[in-house]
């Protein structure tokens, strides 16, 4: 794995990973997509049929497989880094972990009504902000770099990450 993006839902992980994949000519893996493929159903259906615990087990299994890949950019799910077992996988992935953040107000704006996001659709804006705050320590433990995305375009975020990767590679050489 060349790079892993973490952050709360709506922080820009999927959009930025797609831009990075194009710019760096690397495959892009979205962990939510990997979970849906493994379960043969969309995430809202997994939550409805099997519950969040089952989803988190599927997510862990998918993460374990994806981080083994030599090349690529991974956009994790918003809750992925919260589980300690996932933190260990991210730590041992030997890839820079970039945390994308946004303010609670910007997150609420981006998520809208939370359609397609089982947790967001059940929460008020205040509860969403509380969840974001509660997850922050887990995100911080994993991150090699944090980028606040509120006032940056996805392209600008991707360019910052590419600059970081160049510096990171120079220091590793």
Swiss-Prot record:
Substrate binds at residues 32, 56, 78, 135. ATP binds at residues 10-15, 117. InterPro entries: P-loop_NTPase, Shikimate/glucono_kinase, Shikimate_kinase/TSH1. Keywords: Amino-acid biosynthesis, Aromatic amino acid biosynthesis, ATP-binding, Cytoplasm, Kinase, Magnesium, Metal-binding, Nucleotide-binding, Transferase. The keyword RNA-binding does not apply. GO terms for molecular function: ATP binding; magnesium ion binding; shikimate kinase activity. It catalyses: shikimate + ATP = 3-phosphoshikimate + ADP + H(+). Its main location: cytoplasm. Binds 1 Mg(2+) ion per subunit. GO terms for biological process: amino acid biosynthetic process; aromatic amino acid family biosynthetic process; chorismate biosynthetic process. Its EC number is 2.7.1.71. It comes from the Bacteria. The keyword Protease does not apply. HAMAP family: Shikimate_kinase (MF_00109). Monomer. This is Shikimate kinase. It comes from Limosilactobacillus fermentum (strain NBRC 3956 / LMG 18251) (Lactobacillus fermentum). The lineage of its organism: Bacteria, Bacillati, Bacillota, Bacilli, Lactobacillales.
